[in-house]
Curated annotation (Swiss-Prot):
Belongs to the prokaryotic/mitochondrial release factor family. It holds the Pfam family RF-1. The modification N5-methylglutamine is found at Q239. One of its GO terms (cellular component) is cytoplasm. The lineage of its organism: Bacteria, Bacillati, Cyanobacteriota, Cyanophyceae, Oscillatoriophycideae. Methylated by PrmC. Methylation increases the termination efficiency of RF1. Peptide chain release factor 1 directs the termination of translation in response to the peptide chain termination codons UAG and UAA. This is Peptide chain release factor 1. Keywords: Cytoplasm, Methylation, Protein biosynthesis. It comes from Trichodesmium erythraeum (strain IMS101). InterPro entries: PCRF, Pep_chain_release_fac_I, Pep_chain_release_fac_I_sf, Prokaryotic/Mito_RF, RF-1. It is found in: Cytoplasm.
Length: 369
């Protein structure tokens, strides 16, 4: 069984794939490296689903043959049993291939291949919330290192008792946004703070925002909307005082976004960094507006919802992490050490299944082929 919409789409993709193959064999196209590369990339993006479709068609033919053998094997119990097993195996294979093809046909998020800025803000809980924000900075840094991604601290606001009031990490590598976009939301922790003498469990939160890297073309910023001031990076006194005003305090009047950037060595570099962060924040606002429109049709999007969405609770007493979107529990210690790949893969799978259900609900009645 395969849905009509799926077969129509697969036939169209296969036709496009074959046309691209012919164009790549054209000597005139080969003379234009830019055009050749563009066509090769387009063909490569279709290769997985086309190969799967070819395998599916072959399995359909094998299934028809096996059913014919089963039909003709009247009185031959051994042949009937062999044919029956083959039919069952092929039906299971076809079901698996259909699911693979559906997933391969799902629209890709255009931001999936982008680098990101990961912002962590301390939420409710006072000093403990800032310490918790610091723990999350460490967790994501460890995970990024495990993925062979490059991590750098773009901006920070240190808390008096340790940790961060706010921190922004820049993470660069392969498919960063495609994975970490599921981490956006409120992360709640339940534990006894180091500042708690009575041993009582406190609940604190930190908010994570995932902002895909953007350039000037994607986000327009009117310079009239920006107020810029400078300060010394080292603070009020001590050995680390920078006597030159290299720190940049940027304020975006329409949105109220304020960015204080001190990480770079020169005022110009800090200004560029602050503008880079502002572009990412404005782009994130635009994405959230788009997602709000989608959510009126679709109840929610896993992990890419609003910042107010509580996505996970970290319970120290029970050594348990509960992901509220998945309704699943995970061991606390490995996650805090950056081993969050299993959680992220579970979110990706859930997201795919939800989109497949929507696709099926909006499509035609299944037909037999």
């Amino acid at each position: 069984m395969a849905e009509t919409y799926l077969l129509d789409k697969l036939k169209s993709v296969e036709q496009t794939y074959n046309e691209l193959t012919l164009r790549l064999a054209d000597p005139d196209v080969a003379k234009d490296p830019s055009e050749f590369q563009k066509l090769a990339k387009a063909r490569s993006s279709l290769e997985e689903v086309v190969n799967c479709y070819v395998e599916w068609k072959n399995a359909q033919e094998e299934l028809a043959d096996a059913k014919e053998i089963l039909k003709e094997a009247v009185g031959d119990l051994e042949m009937q049993e062999m044919a029956k097993v083959e039919v069952e195996d092929l039906e299971a294979k076809l079901e698996s291939l259909e699911n693979q093809m559906k997933i391969a046909l799902l629209p890709r998020d255009p931001n999936d291949d982008k680098n990101i800025m990961l912002e962590i803000r301390a939420g409710t809980g006072g000093d403990e919330a800032s310490i918790w924000a610091g723990d999350l900075v460490r967790m994501y840094s460890r995970y990024s290192e495990n993925q062979s991604w490059k991590v750098s601290l773009l901006s920070e606001s240190l808390a008096d008792m340790g940790g961060f009031k706010e921190a922004i990490l820049e993470i660069k590598g392969d498919h960063v946004y495609s994975k970490l976009k599921f981490e956006a939301g409120v992360h709640r922790v339940q534990r006894v703070p180091v500042t708690e003498a009575g041993g009582r469990v406190h609940t604190s939160t930190a908010t994570v925002a995932i902002m895909p890297e953007v350039d000037d073309v994607e986000v327009e910023i009117d310079q009239k909307d920006i107020e810029l001031s400078t300060a010394r990076s080292g603070g009020a006194g001590g050995q680390n005082v920078n006597k030159v005003e290299t720190a940049v305090d940027l304020f975006h009047k329409p949105t109220g976004i304020r960015i204080f950037c001190t990480q770079e060595r020169s005022q110009l570099q800090n200004r560029e960094r602050a503008m880079q962060i502002l572009r990412a924040k404005l782009y994130e606002i635009k994405l959230q507006e788009q997602q709000a429109e989608v959510s009126s049709i679709r109840r929610s999007q896993v992990g890419t919802g609003s910042r107010s969405e509580k996505i996970r609770t970290y319970n120290y007493k029970d050594n348990r992490v509960t992901d509220h979107r998945l309704n699943q529990n995970f061991s606390l210690v490995p996650l805090l050490e950056g081993d969050i790949e299993n959680v992220i893969q579970a979110c990706i799978t859930q997201d795919q299944q939800e989109r497949l259900q929507e696709l099926a609900a909006s499509s035609s009645t299944p037909i037999s082929v």
